[in-house]
Each structure stands twice: as C-alpha cells, then as structure tokens.
Amino acid sequence: EELQSLIGFLPQEFGTYETMSAWDYLDYQAILKGLMDSKVRSERLEYVLKAVHMYEKRNAKINSFSGGMKQRIGIALILLHLPRILVVDEPTAGLDPRERIRFRNLLVELSRDRIVIFSTHIIEDIASSCNQVAVINKGELKYYGKPTDMIYLAQNKVWTFDITPELFETLDPRLIVNHMQDGELVSVRYISTEAPQENAVRTEPNLEDAYLCLLKNL
C-alpha cells in the first residue's frame, strides 16, 4: 500500500462522468480517495487543475472538452494523492498534432519534480520528451539508456536511395523505414548492415532508425 501511494497510473482509456464539470468530477474522486476535509480538498483541486493548465475550465462540463483536455483531466485525477511517480499508457494516442505537442510538454513540465514513465509507439514523443528510454519487444528488454546513445546503435546502418517501383517490390519490407513516390522512382530510407543498392548513400540515423534496428537485431 505504501508503494501504491507513491504511484499514479493513467491507462490509455479511462472513464469520466461526462455531464459533470471538471471541478465536480475531481471533487467527487477526491472524496473517494479519502480527502474528506473540504478546505484541503479545495486546495488540492486548485493545485492539480493549475498543474495541468485546466483551472480556467474548472466549471465547464467534461463532455465539452477535446481529447487532449480530457487527458489533462486524467492527469489531474492521478495527481490528487500527490504521487512521486506517474505512469501513463499511450498518453498521446488519438490526439491531433497540436494537442499531442501540448500534452507532451505537460509531461515534461511535470517531470521536473517527479518521475514520469510513459509507454508509447510514437517515436517523436520519445525524442522530444525523454532523457531515458527503454525498448521492450515481446517481453524482452532490448535497450535501456539515453536516446542519444540509442541513436548511435544505428550508425552506418541507415541508407537512402531512389529505386524503380519494380525493384522496390524486391526489398525486405521489414527494413524499410519510410518511402515516397518521387516521379517515376521511389525514394527509400532503409536499414541494413550493408548497402542495399549500388546507389545507396549512408545517412545519419535518428531515433526511429535505431528503434527499428533494435527490433530487427541489426
């Protein structure tokens, strides 16, 4: 129970009472968590709503909120018992690019005085937010360390080249980072320990390249 009190967990999907205001919903949840003193509870609600930049919306009904705003209410909820560790699962899934950036910045802000652990498949979120990263594939820890050190693992393994659509079909799709039709040719970014085509040029890796290299054991 002592360890549990230190952790706040936000699942990828969580339920709320949509017709309640943000304040009333959090007030109700605070009572369920044992915060019975009305003065203490009011101060706590003000603190968590300001922490997630939702205090100005405290009297608005939750069903009027965007996806990103609801996620912030979720963070406010798990902050109610002042945890030292926040665990959030796929926090930016389903958010539009602008809301994703805002929520990502919120997690960085909250990490200044607590530990924030979040799982995600969005590589950009990791590159922009994390100072430590763990890559887990099928229950196996493939990497743990700094993102910059992880990128180094893909050094000399990333290639770019243009290729005809016919030859593109012969490439191993598991090693294609991305591709784009460019006129009559296809521009390809590819991971391999050796040059995949005669015209392939080595390029500087990024975190996504390194992630794929780890998954493919390159």
Spell out what each predicted region is.
Residues 13, 18-32:
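Q-loop/switch helix immediately C-terminal to the Walker
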Residues 27, 31, 39-57:
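Conserved ABC ATPase "signature" region
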Residues 103-190:
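ABC transporter nucleotide-binding domain
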Residues 75:
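Hydrophobic anchor residue at the start of the ABC signature
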Residues 92-93, 123:
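Short loop immediately C-terminal to the Walker-B catalytic DE motif
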Residues 61-65:
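Conserved ABC ATPase signature
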Residues 86-89:
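Catalytic Walker B motif of ABC-type/P-loop ATPase nucleotide-binding domains
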